[in-house]
């Protein structure tokens, strides 16, 4: 693999993990087979991110629109989520990785909410990498919940309208004090944002990979970082 510039590693990488279903269909399998193999790709992505010094990795696991999928698939995804929490959290903790679940967790079963709380509590003081799993998440929902939170603070006299600015709103998003996204990766060849981290990707570099998510490995991730390092980020400014 091409070596990375250690002085130009993106702090925050977000990934839209797309293509599990198509990967399974290409192999004549049920869609859930693709999701299960997608978990293996998650493990490899997390390991790579920690190894190269990425500080925050956000993975889009289940959007608020995914509830519209067939009930059988949704139920299988919820069971897989529970299983992954059981199997992976201790490994994350051992590797000093902090886990956050971003999204409206009240939409999940009480047992899943309890597992989420336990996992976040166990890993809350870890510092090597912050792993955000966006589940029952949508970028529009995130901005709306932040706006409601600020409106409630104004109503209670804790915040003046004139004090609301971009920084204050950003702190009210589910990502809170985390850095803005530097690099957004989407797999499977699709070139859409799909309501993901709409505020947080304002100045992100976009990288679209034709590889289906279960086949997205360390080599593919490395190529995405290389592409990022070859770009000149202007943040709205002019070319020098």
Swiss-Prot record:
GO cellular component, one term: cytosol
EC number: 2.5.1.31
Catalytic site: 18, 66 (proton acceptor)
Keyword Oxidoreductase: no
Cofactor comment: Binds 2 magnesium ions per subunit.
Subunit structure: Homodimer.
Name under which the protein is recorded: Ditrans,polycis-undecaprenyl-diphosphate synthase ((2E,6E)-farnesyl-diphosphate specific)
Naturally occurring in which organism (per UniProt): Pasteurella multocida (strain Pm70)
């Amino acid at each position: 693999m091409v070596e990375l510039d250690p002085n130009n590693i993106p702090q925050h990488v977000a990934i839209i993990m797309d293509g599990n279903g198509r990967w399974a269909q290409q192999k004549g399998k049920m869609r859930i087979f693709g999701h299960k193999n997608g978990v293996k790709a998650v493990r490899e992505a997390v390991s790579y991110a920690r190894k190269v010094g990425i500080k925050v990795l956000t993975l889009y696991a289940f959007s608020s629109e995914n509830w519209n999928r067939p009930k059988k698939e949704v139920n299988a995804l919820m069971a897989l989520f529970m299983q992954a929490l059981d199997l992976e959290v201790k490994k994350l903790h051992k590797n000093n990785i902090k886990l956050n679940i971003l999204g409206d967790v009240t939409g999940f079963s009480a047992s899943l909410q309890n597992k989420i709380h336990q996992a976040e509590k166990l890993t809350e003081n870890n510092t090597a990498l912050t792993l955000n799993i966006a589940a029952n998440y949508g970028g529009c929902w995130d901005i709306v919940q932040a706006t409601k939170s600020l409106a409630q603070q104004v109503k209670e006299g804790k915040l003046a309208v004139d004090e609301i600015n971009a920084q204050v709103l950003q702190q009210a998003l589910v990502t809170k004090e985390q850095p803005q996204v530097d690099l957004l990766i989407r797999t499977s060849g699709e070139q859409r944002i799909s309501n993901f981290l709409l505020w947080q990707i304002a100045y992100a570099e976009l990288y679209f990979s034709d590889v289906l998510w279960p086949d997205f490995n360390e080599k593919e991730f490395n190529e995405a970082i290389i592409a990022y390092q070859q770009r000149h980020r202007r943040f709205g400014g002019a070319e020098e």
